[in-house]
Structures are given as structure tokens and as C-alpha cells.
Amino acid sequence: MIEIGKTIIKFPPLIEGILIKRYKRFLADIELDDGEVVTAHCANTGPMKGVLWPGGRVRLKYSPSPKRKLDWSWEQAEVPSHNEKKKCWVGINTSLPNKLIKHLIEANCLERQFGQISSIKPEVVYGLERKSRIDLLLYPSIQNEDSRKIFVEVKNTTWCDDSLALFPDTVTTRGQKHLKELMSVYPDSRAVLIPCISRSDMELFSPGEIADPEYGRLFREALTKGVEVIPCAFGFFIDHITWEGTRPLKSSR
């Protein structure tokens, strides 16, 4: 088990620079600290509310490959924290949260919530019309009292209001559908939503119904219909990511 505050993933040091602009959803121009201006791929196609700061510091991964159109990937952004005297690095790569949560489960960091897990399958087809894919499907060990499969949907969470982490940061019909799909698998299986809070300065999690009122309504309905919510927080550094523990849920308005 990985202790809170300890490293969960290590990687080569990222390259720092200054964000010039983000455009066409997938692209960002960044001036590196040596003065070179590069164009990086931005995996987060949403509005990036609260974390998009032109002139702010960012961190990039350099991974040239003939298979890639761009050699650079935007990984992290430095933003003002709710503590005005501090800043916080935020993970903005939306392909990372599934890997982080899978690491957590494999390291038994969520054993209290899930028990022993014998296997994990990613991107399994499920849902009312069999057209959705669940992020992680967990198969419990035979030692578990609850033998039901566990459907886990992971959401990258970067927006906040003071110390309250919020998801979504815009209207998301896809996210609304995921809540409906989770409700449909209960009670035959367990249904779990994990907001992956990609910053270490948040104290609570709540649905971002200011941005998407319908999502907030469905979120509260899901809670009454057996869907579990386990917000998990992480800290982002230049060469590693730390496990910062779970956060309480604030489901009321």
C-alpha cells in the first residue's frame, strides 16, 4: 500500500515554460525557459475552467516519434491556490486519471472501499444500449464478502471553487449518460464514480452543477440509487505524482 503523500508514479523530469495561448482545443503554444517557442498537444479538450492561464507556468513532456504529429505534450499547469499565498500544480492530461486510479487499486490503496481485487479490465463495453465503455471493471477476490463486479467510472477533476473540487466544468451530455449507465448496473453490480482530483489543494468534492445543472440533478439521483462516489486526490510534481488520499463528498447544493 502506498502511504498518503508518497509517490505513485515517477517519470523523467518535465520541461517548464510559459503558456502563450491554447487554441483549436488540441493545441497550445508555449515558450520554454530557454526562449524556444513550441506547439504542444493538449489532451484536455474542455474549457479548462480555472486552470487556463495565459502567461502562467506549464510543464511539458518531450516525446518525439514518427507516429506523432507533435513532439510535445502539455501535462501540468501552475495555478493560484485557494490559499492566496501559494500556487498549485494541476494535472491537465485527461489520459492520465485512469492510469492513476488503476495504480491505486493495484497497490491496495482503496482496499477499504473495494476489498481485495483479483483482476482489472479497462474499457469494457456495457450500458443500456451496450454502446458505452466503463473505464475500469473490477473483479473481486473470492475472499471478499461482496462478490459483485465493480464498475468504475473515472473523471478528471481540475476546476474548483475555493477548496471545493468540482466536476464538470461545462455541460457534459457524455457525463450525464455515464451517470445513467452507472445507475443501470446496480444492484446486480457495484457502481462507483471516482472524481480524480488532479491537484493537492482541494478539501472536498461536489458536482459542478453551476456549469451543468442536469449533471447535478443526475448526480444526486445516482446517490439515491446505489452509485458510490470516491473522490481521490493527487499531487503533481516535475518528475512524479503523489497519492494525497480520498476527499469527502459534498452532495448538497
UniProtKB/Swiss-Prot annotation:
Spell out the family assignment given in the record's similarity comment.
Belongs to the SfsA family.
Q: Where are the transmembrane segments?
A: none
Q: Which Pfam families match?
A: SfsA, SfsA_N
Q: Which PANTHER family match?
A: SUGAR FERMENTATION STIMULATION PROTEIN A
An example molecular function term from Gene Ontology annotations: DNA binding
> Which protein is depicted?
Sugar fermentation stimulation protein homolog
Native source organism of the sequence: Prochlorococcus marinus (strain NATL1A)
The gene from which this protein is expressed is sfsA
Q: Which InterPro entries match?
A: SfsA, SfsA_C, SfsA_N
